[in-house]
Amino acid sequence: VNELEISLKDAHFWGMDEWYEDGSEVSMEHPLSFEKADRELCFDRIREDLRPPEQNLHFPKADVTAYRESWNGVRCVVMQGGQGDVKHWAFNDPLRREGAYADEPPSPEEYRSLATRVVELHPITLSQNARTSGGGNVTMVPQQAITVGPQETWQAERVSIWQAGTHDNPLGQRLTALMISKGVADSAVPMSLLADHPNVRFSYYLGGLGSCSVEMH
């Protein structure tokens, strides 16, 4: 952006998620704050005369009203994300299998009706974020988060998923590509619900694709 002098004055950015703790979104003082990372790793590095105005940066808050309304009347060209071990995008984790979902997960239609919301995080997600971002300290990772939902995801013209081999394993990277390409949508594998989105692109880092061969260590 700086080198090519691309003005982002008319651009909008939506953060996909933020940690939720003690009834509120975490502050940027939290070491794992997504807003802090977005600002320090991206926007603070863009020349001030080129970066988007503050009012065009939308970060999820405990009260999701303003965040959800910010999607109205604005074109979201691309939603850029990744895939977690639990097969989520953002923090759209599989729902807890209890109550009405004890025997069957919610239908794809029911899951796709979800909007930006506060969610309970799957234990696999907690472990993954401790491993990839917290130096292995799982007690640092909040057990809830605010996440962009399928409703907003379907407002994006394209959903782009980078598979770098860091956040999911060799089987998982292949599984969701197979399910999406075959039109198999199952909310137990949330990423597979993108089978019904009109424009999904997976980009793989070959060095991180790995092998599904079985080997004991």
Model-derived features: positions:
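Ligand-binding beta-strand-loop-alpha-helix segment within the catalytic cores
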Residues: 4-80, 140
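A short secondary-structure junction signal
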Residues: 69, 89-104, 171-175, 214-215
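A glycine-rich beta-strand to alpha-helix segment
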Residues: 74-98
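Class I SAM-dependent methyltransferase SAM-binding "motif I" and its flanking Rossmann-like core
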Residues: 90-142
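ATP/nucleoside-binding phosphotransfer catalytic cores, i.e., glycine-rich phosphate-binding loops
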Residues: 148-217
